[in-house]
């Protein structure tokens, strides 16, 4: 058996604004701790305010 690569456990994801749908942030997440889609409150430069950003595939 081979060891899992870090990219398998921590894949790169894109966060998109839920209001204007613009993809503003690129980050990684731990698939074991958060198997469902990530939701974070981040600043959207297009909206000019803090909005909920959801993980896109």
Curated annotation (Swiss-Prot):
Superkingdom of origin: Bacteria
Cellular component GO terms, alphabetical: cytoplasm; ribonucleoprotein complex; ribosome
Listed GO biological process terms: translation
Gene3D superfamilies referenced in this protein's UniProt entry, alphabetically: Ribosomal protein L33
PROSITE patterns, per the entry: RIBOSOMAL_L33 (PS00582)
Signal peptide annotation: none
GO molecular function, one term: structural constituent of ribosome
InterPro entries (alphabetical): Ribosomal_bL33 (IPR001705), Ribosomal_bL33_CS (IPR018264), Ribosomal_bL33_sf (IPR038584), Ribosomal_zn-bd (IPR011332)
Keywords, ordered alphabetically: Ribonucleoprotein, Ribosomal protein
Family: Belongs to the bacterial ribosomal protein bL33 family.
NCBIfam families: PRK00504.1 (NF001764), PRK00595.1 (NF001860), rpmG_bact (TIGR01023)
UniProt cross-references to HAMAP family, sorted A to Z: Ribosomal_bL33
Official protein name in the record: Large ribosomal subunit protein bL33
Organism from which the protein derives: Bifidobacterium longum (strain NCC 2705)
């Amino acid at each position: 058996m081979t060891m899992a690569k870090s990219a398998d456990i921590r894949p790169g994801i894109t966060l998109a604004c839920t209001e204007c749908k613009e993809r503003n942030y690129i980050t990684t997440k731990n698939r074991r701790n958060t198997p469902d889609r990530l939701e974070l409150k981040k600043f959207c430069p297009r909206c000019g305010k803090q909005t909920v950003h959801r993980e896109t595939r």
